[in-house]
Amino acid sequence: RMEVKEAVILDFLMDRMIQAVLYYDTDRELNAIDSRVLSFISDNYKKAYSYQAEGKSEAEKLYLRLLLVTDYVCGMTDSYAKRLYQDMNGII
């Protein structure tokens, strides 16, 4: 049962975070929700992305944005991922 719960949490976080970063660092304006979701990602991860993305094509930047999310979610503790999932879903 625990693995199923964890898979649901990770799937949700990955889906939501990926949606939020799709247009990060592009000419397209982010909506309020995506901006808020991006605010959860630490500046260290964003700085690493910016460093790596400098001078890259849009396709390469998209790959790096997806990697940004993967690195962020993989770096979460189980308890933090669960708490973030609950917060994002309004679960108390």
Task: Give, region by region, the residue ranges found by the protein language model.
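Histidine-centered, transition-metal-coordinating active-site segments
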Residues: R1-I92
